[in-house]
Amino acid sequence: MYKEVLYEVKLKSKCIKGDMMGFEVSDRAKEINERLEAFMEEYIYPRERDYDEFTNDQNNLWQYPDWYEKLKEEAKKQELWNLFLPKEYAPWSPGLTNLEIAGLFETMSRSAWSQQIFNCNAPDRGNMEVLAKYGTPEQQKQWLEPLLAGEIRSAYAMTEPDVASSDATNMELEITRDGDEYVLNGKKWWTTNVITPKCKFMLVMGKSNPENPRHTQHSTIIVPTDAEGFTITRALRSLGELHSPGGEGDVVFKNVRVPVSN
């Protein structure tokens, strides 16, 4: 059954082979995708059943299989690591365009979990782009480099339980300056990836300038997951699933203090 399903998915996903709606894909991107497809065949698809059995076992909540890191090391060895960063993010980018990256993601997405093996999954992917573009050298050294190396994971906290969070200007979590620190108070939920022990920090959106016009009231700040006053109150279910090992967290910030440099 697994082979039949995988075969059907692969048949439907071939845009990287040639042109995409008139957009040409470089020979380099095609070559990378060929290696990526070979990796999926050799290392990912044979582990699909193992992954499902491991993550569906309640005794393994918020843990990763023992073989997980071995696959990540193999992806690094084959230079299939951090492929998602567009070329403007030098020196960390492999130098691909967004068009070229799109086809690679199509291949990775034939497995629900394989993007993690290539260090290309959300929310880490988005957080790495934010830190690469806007982070200070100190922030990049402390948070971006370990993320790029796959040593840690991260979360992005935006959605709130008490407001219509599809409009980001509604966010109410308070970010107040107190000397050399910012103090955070509020709630977030559906905070993807926050429950896994490997998650070491979050990018948190909150209201830092309530007196400003509506679209300039908010800021994003780095908050370590071990910060005093930060609590994960429960794991949320999506479509009945806990989505271990990353999880979806209902979280509270109660007088959480972080340096202004964050």
PLM segments and residue spans:
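Short Gly/Pro-enriched turn/cap motifs at secondary-structure boundaries
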Residues: 162-166, 193-197, 210-212, 239-247
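A structural signal for short hydrophobic beta-strand segments in well-ordered beta-sheet cores
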Residues: 173-176
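Structural signature of FAD isoalloxazine-binding scaffolds in flavoprotein oxidoreductases
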Residues: 95-107, 167-170, 252, 257-258
